[in-house]
């Protein structure tokens, strides 16, 4: 920086004419230490250049002071006059700071001409008064424990810039003398007497002065506070020692106030701490105020207080939480009994059931066995009972003697009595138990007395016997009749009905059902007059106490509900084409029966299949036996074209009915099927093959893509089975290894108990084809003339008579298949 200033100066000199320069500089000036701000240090002026260019505002200024400082600045007085003053930013201290500063004054005008000169400022020494350092300069609080022996309290120290640096001692003294304190010349504060907190001042204010060699002084304040120590025992000030407390006072109720004082803390009672030293959960003490409050329910009538109502406590007062001084006092509380428990009972509701024939004067209930009063002292624990009340109970129940709580019966309890029925045979009695002492607490007792009915009357049916008629065609659930049994006893108990005997048929163990609640008799299935026309039943009724029975006769009224049944039901006949008219075809005879119709009531007619009316029956009515006759000859050259006739024969049981009654009467019709084959004139010898049955079994495996889950499940099951077998093999190998690695001594006992093998019965699923072996038709072989029997449903045939046993014919192969249009030949099933 100094090199830059020199360059500027040379530039100004070489610019031509008389140069800008500072007057009265360089120079040396003095300034006193601790000079205040704006203190004049030196004045100087500026000689302008020939051009008279003014000094730039802000110049001259101090640059590069040595040592560096901000304690000085240049003030402008006029255009050419200036002064150097102190700034106050830094304290000029002769003893601790620089004693001289070299200030370079730099000036510059508008045309750039500059000049630099040096001002040397010397700091001069000034005698300063001594100073107290730190918090001592602001005043100091000193604490002295009471009853401390007289002696040293504190060492006061001050600083003087001149004397301290030259090791000249300062002088200390008390500006305000005290008989309790003194101070030495070197600044030591002593106490001259023993200080007592309770007897004298609690604190002292001292003014301490210090003087240097130039007689300059300084002072500071000392406050000496006497610290109280705990040297006095607290004293109880409450005179009372016995207190009476009513029981059941609310928790937190103040029952006593213990007060005490401590001479050490006179005027500050809140500094004492109270506590209860004896073990008691009934009371607690506020440790700050000494008030004793109820901490637990005071029940004079229960627990230890019922035996001993006196509670003794020891109260301790201390002047600090731990250590210190303490005092103790014994106080006593007497818990007084009050009438706080109403007379009560272990049960407040009673239910009594009495037989209806209970005698008057019977003791029903003694309330004294259930009621009590928990109060501990008389008269609080005495009680009595009020007069019983309740609708309808005044003439039936009372106390004997009055107020004793002994309830006795005084009226009639007949269950069937209308007045008793009006109240439902239930009597609600209310009686109150109350205290004998104020405030006369009461509690209500409710007694419900129920009359238990007794079985006085038998259970009887309304009639000694019952007779019902029912037509045989009535369906199941048809109501036949109703029986009813009653009991004069109240309450009415439900009667349960049952059929104990009778009513069985060949197919059913009982065709009758009786409603167990209503006694209504119904049909389970249709009855059959022809099988059983009269049923005699025994119906039993019970109400849980009694049992009674009655005979019920059910007449099954007959109706025409059976169809005529004829034999044979199906028949096959073969006749030659030239059979004579009026011939009984193959001596065929039809025999019919009807369970509910006479033989003369049958009428025969041919329905479908009698083409051109070639066939008729004789007789066609009035008999149960008829024959099939040829009514007209066959003419295949003209109208006839059918060779096989399937005749549906109707047998009706209305022959005896007139035209007016036939429309209203029940008519049944049976049917018979006849097969007649007309045999043409033979041109060659016809051999009749033996009848046989050919079975063709065809098996075919077809795979459907929609059944993908079948192989998937099979595969998954196989994998799981293999995994299970593998795990079992591993477990087996481990078990064998453990067994083999153990002792080789033969075990006396078997490792496992032998299990009983269970016999497994395998059920074989057999698919059988049941052939109908009933041969219900006969026919004549037109070639041999022999008679054979046949089954109309399966087509099976067998020879009748000595040809029953036939030799076995070779069976055709099951793989044989007939050609198109070839019907399988039935297999002979002769027996």
Swiss-Prot record:
Q: Which InterPro entries match?
A: Cadherin-domain_protein (IPR050971), Cadherin-like_dom (IPR002126), Cadherin-like_sf (IPR015919)
According to the entry, every stretch annotated as the Cadherin domain falls at 24-132, 136-236, 237-344, 346-466, 462-570, 567-693
Recorded GO cellular component terms are: plasma membrane
> Which residue ranges have biased composition labelled Polar residues?
805-817
User: Which compartments is it annotated to reside in?
Assistant: Cell membrane
Q: Where is the signal peptide?
A: 1-19
What CDD domains does the database record attribute to this sequence?
Answer: Cadherin_repeat
* Residue numbers on the Cytoplasmic membrane side: 733-831
Q: Report how it sits in the membrane.
A: Single-pass type I membrane protein
Q: Where is this region: Disordered?
A: 743-763, 798-831
Q: Where are the transmembrane segments?
A: 712-732
What sections of the sequence does the record tag as coiled-coil? none
- The superkingdom listed in its UniProt entry is Eukaryota
Extracellular topology ranges: 20-711
Q: In its keyword annotation, does this UniProt entry include Ion transport?
A: no
Sugar-modified residues? 47, 186, 257
Any one Gene Ontology molecular-function term assigned to this protein's record: calcium ion binding
Pfam families on file: Cadherin (PF00028)
Q: Where is the composition biased (Basic and acidic residues)?
A: 749-763
GO biological process per UniProt? homophilic cell adhesion via plasma membrane adhesion molecules
Q: Which UniProt keywords apply?
A: Calcium, Cell adhesion, Cell membrane, Glycoprotein, Membrane, Repeat, Signal, Transmembrane, Transmembrane helix
Give the PANTHER family listed for this entry: CADHERIN DOMAIN-CONTAINING PROTEIN (PTHR24025:SF30), DESMOGLEIN FAMILY MEMBER (PTHR24025)
Question: What does the UniProt function comment say about this protein?
Answer: Cadherins are calcium-dependent cell adhesion proteins. They preferentially interact with themselves in a homophilic manner in connecting cells; cadherins may thus contribute to the sorting of heterogeneous cell types.
Name used for this protein in its record: Cadherin-related family member 3
Q: What species does this protein belong to?
A: Mus musculus (Mouse)
